[in-house]
């Protein structure tokens, strides 16, 4: 619970501008881990040089961060939020669990830069994301998805 609270203390700047921060997160994810871009069919043809500032990427980044905000505010009681997300990401989008680990590290960096997430907050965010990803993976296994 303390980890969730520590992350939520720095969540304000993210909440204030989901679109910009979301765009930064996805752009950095795609630049640092180019294979992840292929998992998003609508972004697959966008050149690396054109990622930053792309409206569709920023809009999807905002969607990602809004969902994460819901998960953070649930403070671990997130089964009803996570289950439908796990279902769509396993059965429709086929997103391997490792990609959530990759985006978590990107999120730590972006929140450090844009939301003032200090070392303790970074550890808290990694812990929170570890909980969310473990629960997501458990849902994946129930669905028979081993990605």
UniProtKB/Swiss-Prot annotation:
Q: Which domain of life is it from?
A: Eukaryota
GO CC annotation, single: extracellular exosome
Binding of O2 occurs at 60
Annotated binding of nitrite, by residue: 60
One Gene Ontology molecular-function label: oxygen binding
An example Gene Ontology biological process: removal of superoxide radicals
Q: Alphabetically list the UniProt keywords.
A: Cytoplasm, Heme, Iron, Metal-binding, Muscle protein, Oxidoreductase, Oxygen transport, Transport
Q: Which Pfam families match?
A: Globin (PF00042)
Protein localization: Cytoplasm, Sarcoplasm
Catalyzed chemical reaction(s): Fe(III)-heme b-[protein] + nitric oxide + H2O = Fe(II)-heme b-[protein] + nitrite + 2 H(+); H2O2 + AH2 = A + 2 H2O
Q: What is its main location?
A: cytoplasm
> Which residues are noted in the entry as heme b-binding?
89
Task: State which Enzyme Commission number(s) the record gives.
Answer: 1.7.-.-, 1.11.1.-
The entry assigns this protein to a family as follows: Belongs to the globin family.
**What this chain does, per the record?**
Monomeric heme protein which primary function is to store oxygen and facilitate its diffusion within muscle tissues. Reversibly binds oxygen through a pentacoordinated heme iron and enables its timely and efficient release as needed during periods of heightened demand. Depending on the oxidative conditions of tissues and cells, and in addition to its ability to bind oxygen, it also has a nitrite reductase activity whereby it regulates the production of bioactive nitric oxide.
Subunit arrangement? Monomeric.
Name the UniProt record assigns to this protein: Myoglobin
């Amino acid at each position: 619970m303390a980890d969730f609270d520590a992350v939520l203390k720095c969540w304000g700047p993210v909440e204030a501008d989901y679109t910009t921060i979301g765009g930064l997160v996805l752009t950095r994810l795609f630049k640092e881990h180019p294979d992840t871009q292929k998992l998003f069919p609508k972004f697959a043809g966008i050149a690396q040089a054109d990622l930053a500032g792309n409206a569709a990427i920023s809009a999807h980044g905002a969607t990602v961060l809004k969902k994460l905000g819901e998960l953070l505010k649930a403070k671990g009681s997130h089964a009803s939020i996570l289950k439908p997300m796990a279902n769509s990401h396993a059965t429709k989008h086929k997103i391997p669990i490792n990609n959530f680990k990759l985006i978590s590290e990107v999120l730590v960096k972006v929140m450090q830069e844009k939301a003032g997430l200090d070392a303790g907050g970074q550890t808290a965010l990694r812990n929170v994301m570890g909980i969310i990803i473990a629960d997501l993976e458990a849902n994946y296994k129930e669905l028979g998805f081993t990605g």
